[in-house]
Amino acid sequence: MHSSVYFVALVILGAAVCAAQPRGRILGGQEAAAHARPYMASVQVNGTHVCGGTLLDEQWVLSAAHCMDGVTDDDSVQVLLGAHSLSAPEPYKRWYDVQSVVPHPGSRPDSLEDDLILFKLSQNASLGPHVRPLPLQYEDKEVEPGTLCDVAGWGVVTHAGRRPDVLHQLRVSIMNRTTCNLRTYHDGVVTINMMCAESNRRDTCRGDSGSPLVCGDAVEGVVTWGSRVCGNGKKPGVYTRVSSYRMWIENITNGNMTS
């Protein structure tokens, strides 16, 4: 489904970046109440969960661009909505084929910037109490440091790499970007288009990439990268700020696929 072709040198460089700044890293959280987060999506490749996502409306899901690294036209990409458990039968869960995959034009495997992707479902999602969109934060203002925000996903929940079958959630505290960029943390690589959250033994982990960071009633960020070791307090979790990409998201979801 992901048709972009990268030069070999770019792929090698991208691998080096990811080794230093691993992608998608819920550790230290707890199981979410079933269907309490009806906006959550599971992005799946060939039937396997790879990333989280946010349902924006009946046809569009927002996630992280790096989730499609290595995915080809021969792979099957689907989005699961209405799920708490990835495997157990549930009355409201349904898989949707993906009609279009639209990565941000600035996203590249050798870069941490512009790490967003939009999936257009092949048919409208059936909305209700268990499947419901969540609004994005479009006001371009910083979230105050110390603000408590929620993140959820089906990613790794232990250092041993155990992946849960049910949705887990975590509350994190927003960190000042200047602090996050200190040499002892991320050493200047966090840009104005990113935001940080404290990660001391409580963090997103592998498989949580693309999941929304929810502050109040809006999506403020998308899980993108962090530490090689999830929950490392010296490597805060980093999220892509959605307000920085308002125009791109609106253009694509309103039908301007060339944006």
From Swiss-Prot:
GO cellular component: extracellular space
Catalysis: reaction(s): Selective cleavage of Arg-|-Lys bond in complement factor B when in complex with complement subcomponent C3b or with cobra venom factor
Proregion span(s): 21-25
InterPro entries with a match to the protein in the record: Peptidase_S1_PA, Peptidase_S1_PA_chymotrypsin, Peptidase_S1A, Trypsin_dom, TRYPSIN_HIS, TRYPSIN_SER
Renumbered residue ranges of the record's region Self-inhibitor loop: 224-228
Superkingdom of origin organism: Eukaryota
Annotated signal sequence range: 1-20
Entry comment, domain topic: The self-inhibition loop inihibits the serine protease activity in absence of factor B (CFB) substrate.
Name of this chain's protein: Complement factor D
Source organism phylogeny: Eukaryota, Metazoa, Chordata, Craniata, Vertebrata
Underlying gene: Cfd
